[in-house]
Regions:
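A general structural signal for well-ordered alpha-helical segments in protein cores
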Residues: 1-2, 19, 36, 53, ...
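Helix N-cap / loop-to-helix initiation motif
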Residues: 15, 32-33, 49, 91, ...
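Glycine-rich anion-binding loops and their surrounding alpha/beta cores
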Residues: 7, 62-65, 87, 102, ...
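Beta-strand segments within the central parallel beta-sheet cores of soluble alpha/beta enzyme folds
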Residues: 38, 54-57, 72, 136-140, ...
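N-terminal basic/disordered segments at the start of proteins
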Residues: 1-13, 20-22, 77-83
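N-terminal glycine-rich anion-binding loops that anchor highly charged ligand groups
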Residues: 8-54, 62-69, 288-289
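Active-site cofactor/substrate anionic-group-binding motifs, chiefly glycine-
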Residues: 47-113
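A glycine-rich phosphate/pyrophosphate-binding beta-strand-loop-alpha-helix module
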Residues: 40, 88-144
Length: 337
């Protein structure tokens, strides 16, 4: 690890094989916490390359559990985090809207690492059992159309890295690896990233890893979501081709909002925000859920265009059925415990 650390601190890029080797040492706990934190920080300062991300992702996936579904018509819906926006859990909240609209969701997530609340924190606050085994997740998806794969359960080697990430408290390559290492190998994904420069990097990585349909997004405010404070950069993957465009809320009848309008808190606070949206609240928080849910509905194949998906998202929320989906999911996960 010292040799690889030296190379990175000198500004040199690692090969795919070297990156995989570094990831192996971090996950297995053969590198000391001091070396791991130094390596993660140095890699972030240098800037992670496509080869480094692919190498680390492949090693991480090789050590994790897996979920096998009978179809590939399902999505993962996740943000990298690390954007410093302190927003509520937008992608996790949006997954319930997608599921209520008929999209099968196999979501991969974790507890908060560089924010107050991660996907696990919100789902737990909504009453779900977040510690299902692979077979139980498969059953949950078959029964409810959605499932949650806890990174700490599926990537058990992460136990050696989790405390280090929490202690240094900054965005690292692990923020990128989570969305890329879905145990179900989802070929349809909506991924929010923390930097406009990383949008094209993610698109290249995902294309190389065989993702068929995806939207990789970053707001003009740096949010790892489709934002309501301005426009959002999108790289859409369509069968290996990458199409670049922007999403402007104004084009869908949605007014710009301030960042303060979409801030969140811990898991319990964010659960209350989600419930308010699902129970009919009209606000910037609802608007951002509409825009992000639409991405999942579109990539999940339930709409022929993003514009059509926005209308479906609005109708789904207004129907009142999303809260039923939350309760159904929570009950099923508890039954499987």
């Amino acid at each position: 690890m010292k040799e690889l650390l030296k190379k990175v601190t000198e500004g040199q890029n690692l090969t795919r094989e070297e990156a995989a080797k570094a990831m192996d040492m971090m996950l297995e706990g053969t590198a000391s916490p001091v070396l791991v934190s130094a390596f993660l920080t140095a890699l972030r300062m240098k800037g992670e390359t496509v080869d480094e991300i692919v190498g680390c992702t492949e090693m991480m996936k090789s050590k994790g559990g897996s979920v096998k579904l009978d179809t590939d018509e399902y999505i993962d819906f996740v943000g990298t985090g690390g954007d410093g926006a302190n927003s509520f859990n937008i992608s996790t909240t949006s997954m319930f809207v997608c599921a209520a609209a008929g999209v099968t969701v196999a979501k991969h997530g974790n507890r908060a690492a560089s924010s107050k609340s991660g996907a696990s924190d919100l789902l737990e606050a909504l009453g779900a059992n977040i510690m299902l085994e692979p077979k139980q997740v498969e059953q949950c998806i078959n029964e409810t159309g959605m499932g949650f794969m806890n990174a700490m359960k599926f990537h058990k080697a992460m136990k050696n890295v989790g405390p280090i990430r929490k202690e240094i408290g900054i965005r690292t390559i692990f923020n990128m690896l989570g969305p890329l290492s879905n145990p179900s190998n989802a070929s349809r994904q909506v991924i929010g990233v923390f930097s406009p420069e990383k949008v094209s990097v993610f698109a290249k990585v995902m294309s190389e890893m065989g993702v068929k349909r995806a939207m990789i997004v970053c707001g003009s405010d740096g949010m790892d979501e489709i934002t309501v404070t301005g426009k959002t950069l999108v790289n859409e993957i369509i069968d290996g081709k990458i199409v670049v465009y922007e999403i402007d809320p104004h084009d869908y009848g949605i007014e710009y909002a301030d960042a303060s309008d979409i801030t969140g808190g811990d898991g319990k606070e964010n659960a209350e925000i989600a419930k308010s949206i699902f129970n009919g609240e009209k606000s910037a928080r609802r608007d951002i859920i509409v825009l992000n849910s639409a991405a999942g509905i579109y990539i999940g194949g339930k709409a022929d265009s993003y514009k059509e998906a926005v209308e479906i998202a609005k109708q789904t929320i207004d129907s009142g059925n999303v809260m039923d989906k939350v309760n159904e999911f929570a009950a099923e996960t508890k039954k499987l415990n």
